[in-house]
Structure formats: C-alpha cells, structure tokens
C-alpha cells in the first residue's frame, strides 16, 4: 500500500465577531439616515403644495384635552396668503423676524442677542426666525433638547431651499397657535373679532401678533394692559420695517418656481 497524500484543508480567515457587529451597526445606521433624509425631503416637497391641516402640536393639545376629560377644541381654517391681510404679514415680520425677507433661515444676530439676554438671567428669550418657527411647528414636537434643535435647523434649511418665502409665510400664518385650541390667523380673526383674516386692520393684526409668544395665556379679543402696550409697540414697528412684498424677492437658484399669489 502506498500512502495517500493528505489533502490540504483551506484555512479560513479568522472572523472577529465584534468587528462584524460594528460594521453591521454602521451599515444599519447609514441606511436609516439615508431613509430619513429621503422621507423628510418627500415630506417637505409635498407640504410645498398641499395645505398643512395637522401639526404635532395640535395632536399634543388634543391628547392633553382628552386626558383632562375635555373634548378637544381644534379651531382652524386654511386660507391662501392672498386671503390674509398684508397687515397680518407686516405685524409678524415686525414682531417676530424683521429680516425675514433677507436671511436664509437663520438670524445669527438675533440668536446672539437672545443668548446674551438669557445669560444675564432675564426672562428666557428665543432668537428663532419665522422659518425656524415654521419648521418646528410643522415637522417637530415641542421640546428643548439638542436633538430637537438640530432637527429644527435641518428642516429650516430644507424649507428655505424647497419653499418660497411666500410659502413659508403662508404655512406659518395657517399653523401657528393663536389661542387655546385656535390655530392660524383665519380662525383667530373669526374667534376674536368676528371677521376674516383678509379684513384685519393694523391694530387687530398687531394684537394677534402680540399674543403669539404665549397665545394660551393672552387673549387678543380681550387684551390686558401688557398686550395693549405690546400691540402699540408692534404697530409702531410696522411703520419702520421694510414693507413686505414677495414679488420683489430675488429667489436663489434653487427656487426656480415662484408662487403666483397676490400680495396686495
């Protein structure tokens, strides 16, 4: 008998379970991030054309009412920007974001002032632009975490790239909380003054704007002395800030399609 050669066995490379697990985790995280980016872009693009009827804040307020044994009040009515008085647009620009037409979503000057103000131990003040507030109201739950602020910045960039300034203002004025269970300036005008948003005077628009920092505490229909003083200040500012005219905005290259709404 002759000895048969022993076949060589293939030596497989040693596997490292820990490295394999880490690689799978990073692949999963990458795919999850890409999915989030894709879905968020689709969401923002769809909201560029469709009315926004429900926001996370509306859901939270409804759940709070139900938990207290109350029937949730949800007064809102979507209207286009040309059905809203220019006085209302001017009032929120004067009171909330006087550089709205010129910035690209962020006002670093206002953010710096708010930071210095808060460091002095005074009443906490935000430095959010109308674009940031719109991103927060439409896409996010109210929260003060760094994650939420990061997502707010992300969605702010998206709407500034995909929406026009006119659309940002239109959505903002339709979804902001303007009272207890009241959302948007059309519902606020009807609730507080018995008129439509297109009929708002400078004084009425300024009253609504004056209550925006805390609309569940203050009532534009029955203003306190503080709200009256704040209203007078806003009316004065309305005459000083640049007149809002969306037709005069030169859109960036990414904004190729302009909304065809009246602004007068």
Q: Which residue ranges define each predicted feature?
A:
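Juxtamembrane regions of bacterial inner-membrane/periplasmic proteins
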Residues: 2-264
């Amino acid at each position: 008998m002759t000895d048969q050669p022993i076949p060589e066995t293939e030596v497989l490379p040693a596997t490292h379970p820990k490295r394999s697990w880490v690689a799978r985790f990073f692949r999963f995280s990458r795919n999850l991030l890409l999915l989030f980016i894709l879905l968020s872009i689709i969401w923002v693009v769809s909201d560029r054309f469709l009315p926004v009827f429900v926001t996370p804040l509306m859901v939270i307020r409804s759940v709070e009412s139900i938990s207290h044994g109350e029937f949730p009040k949800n007064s809102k009515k979507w209207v286009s920007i040309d059905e809203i008085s220019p006085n209302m647009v001017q009032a929120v620009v004067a009171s909330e974001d006087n550089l709205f037409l010129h910035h690209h979503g962020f006002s670093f000057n206002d953010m710096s002032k708010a930071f210095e103000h808060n460091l002095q131990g005074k009443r906490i003040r935000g430095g959010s632009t109308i674009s940031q507030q719109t991103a927060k109201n439409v896409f996010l739950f109210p929260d003060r975490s760094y994650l939420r602020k990061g997502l707010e910045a992300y969605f702010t960039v998206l709407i500034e790239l995909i929406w026009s300034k006119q659309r940002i203002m239109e959505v903002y004025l339709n979804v902001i909380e303007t009272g207890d269970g009241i959302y948007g300036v059309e519902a606020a005008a009807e609730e507080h003054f018995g008129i439509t948003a297109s009929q708002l005077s400078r004084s009425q628009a300024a009253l609504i704007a004056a209550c925006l920092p805390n609309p569940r505490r203050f009532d534009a229909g029955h203003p306190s002395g503080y709200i009256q003083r704040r209203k007078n200040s806003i009316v004065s500012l309305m005459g000083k800030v640049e007149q809002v005219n969306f037709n005069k905005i030169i859109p960036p290259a990414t904004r190729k399609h302009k909304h065809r709404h009246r602004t007068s």
